[in-house]
Regions:
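Extended alpha-helical scaffolding segments
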Residues: 1-51, 55-56, 72-454
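Short metal-coordination and nucleic-acid-contact micro-motifs, chiefly zinc-binding Cys/His arrays
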Residues: 57-63
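Short Cys/His-rich metal-coordination motifs, predominantly Zn2+-binding knuckles/fingers
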Residues: 68
Length: 454
């Protein structure tokens, strides 16, 4: 009937071809006083339409929806979610039951986790829309991070991904401006960013999802104010802050850069553990303790390579300051060299000085005491340091008088801070961390002085 009458209607005649070609149609209303509004904005109309939609399939199984809490027709199969990196190109399911072993109480398919047709359509449509917008999502390892603000402003997700993953300069934002914005938001102050005003009280959501064949798994789903997320990120950045080599131009270390410090870069598989990346992401965003696997991974790489890089030193510092915030750790794990009398820290500094003495006495040497003695000096100082100190005395004799006086003074000052009982027999894991930080600080001070002289 309508197909015969509608084309002849004067208001529809000109647009009928478009309307009849799979176009979307929105109904509106004009009140007697001339006001216009869309039918889709009226709560009563929306509820009536949804009620009709929920009961349109008489054969559909009804149950209480786990999302809306209302009795409605249950989605037997949920729509596919596309755009998750690493998942099937055709899409993957967040909720699916494709074998009897996964079902309970005689239910089939979606009835095992009842979600209404509307809710299934709504969450998959919204998630697909966000995944299609590269300003809202970022991949780190096998985890795809999707974030959004409650007011739907893209500036919030843009800023969060810059804070979290870097890449600010590629989007026309300087590192200094980004750091200033993060600091202001972490202190609860609104800032202007990307032609928008960021409100620290704005509700913000972060979802982490990972692919597994035809399914998706939720690594985390976090909700907080944008300002609280900013504070957690600022605290993380402050804990990571440490003196860096002159060649390292990075202002901040991204999550991926931190995870890479746990990987053997000479191995075939250079990807960090997906579980580690997910746990690290959650710890940073929530302000919670860092995962023990992060410390274990870094410690293993230091032992294997006998190298304390900026990233590894930053991880050690951040880990102990967050997970064990004692006054002693706050004294030892600082940004740059400090005069702490903590024995493991002093031993790390001493080892660096002994290595320098050897290098100055033997220019062009291919291997230093670090290659042979670092691990034993770090774990069992009493077995390594007596030999190293004796060796240093021989190296001092090869030097010119100014160098000999300079390094002898350094040795004397550091040795004076050690206990009268001598070198410790062994160091615990936290003490080994202090040793490695002391070694890193002293070594960076030496390199900084060398660069100034050049």
């Amino acid at each position: 009937m309508y197909k015969r009458q509608a084309p002849a209607h004067p208001l529809l005649a000109e647009q009928w071809a478009d309307l009849n070609n799979n176009a979307n149609l929105v109904f509106g209303y004009e009140s007697p006083d001339g006001a216009h509004w869309l039918a889709t904005t009226d709560d009563a109309i929306r509820d009536a339409w949804q009620s009709a939609f929920d009961t349109s399939d008489a054969d559909a199984e009804t149950a209480r929806c786990l999302i809306t809490g209302k009795e409605a027709g249950i989605a037997r199969i949920h729509p596919a979610i596309k755009g998750v990196m690493g998942a099937q190109a055709a899409g993957a399911a967040l909720v699916s039951f494709n074998a009897p072993a996964f079902c309970s109480y005689g239910h089939e398919q979606g009835a095992n986790a009842p979600v209404s047709e509307y809710a299934a359509f709504a969450y998959t449509t919204a998630l697909n829309l966000l995944l299609a917008d590269r300003n809202c999502c970022q991949r780190i390892g096998d985890t795809t991070i999707v974030c959004w603000a409650e007011n739907a402003s893209p500036a919030y997700s843009n800023a969060m991904l810059m804070f979290f993953c870097g890449g600010a300069e590629a989007r026309g934002v300087s590192e200094s401006d980004l750091a200033a914005a993060l600091k202001a938001l972490s202190q609860g102050r609104p800032v202007s960013f990307l032609d928008d005003k960021l409100d620290p009280n704005q509700n913000f959501y972060v979802l982490g999802i990972s692919p597994n064949a035809a399914r998706l798994s939720v690594r985390f789903f976090l909700h907080n104010s944008f300002g609280q997320f900013a504070k957690n990120l600022q605290d993380h950045a402050d804990r990571l802050s440490i003196t860096r080599p002159a060649f390292d131009k990075r202002e901040n270390l991204s999550v991926w850069a931190l995870a890479q410090e746990t990987v053997n870069q000479r191995s075939r598989d250079k990807n960090p553990s997906p579980q580690l990346v997910g746990d690290l992401l959650r710890a940073i965003l929530t302000g919670g303790p860092y995962p023990a696997t992060l410390l274990n991974g870094v410690t293993l790489r230091i032992r294997a390579e006998r190298e304390v890089t900026r990233g590894r030193a930053a991880i050690l510092k951040a880990y102990y300051l967050r997970n064990y915030p004692t006054e002693l750790n706050k004294e030892v794990f600082t940004v740059s060299l400090n005069e702490s009398s903590n024995v493991p820290y002093v031993l790390g500094r001493l080892f660096s000085v002994l290595e320098t003495i050897q290098s100055v006495a033997n220019p062009g040497i291919n291997a230093t005491i670090k290659d042979r003695y670092f691990n034993s000096a770090c774990a069992t100082p009493a077995t390594a340091f007596p030999t190293l100190v004796k060796l240093a005395q021989k190296h001092l004799q090869k030097m010119s008088t100014p160098n000999e006086v300079h390094f002898s003074k350094q040795l004397t000052e550091l040795m004076a801070q050690l206990p009268e009982t001598g070198f410790p027999a062994r160091l615990s894991l936290p003490e080994q961390g202090a040793f490695e930080i002391g070694y890193y600080h002293q070594t960076q001070k030496r390199f900084a002085k060398k660069n100034e002289e050049e």
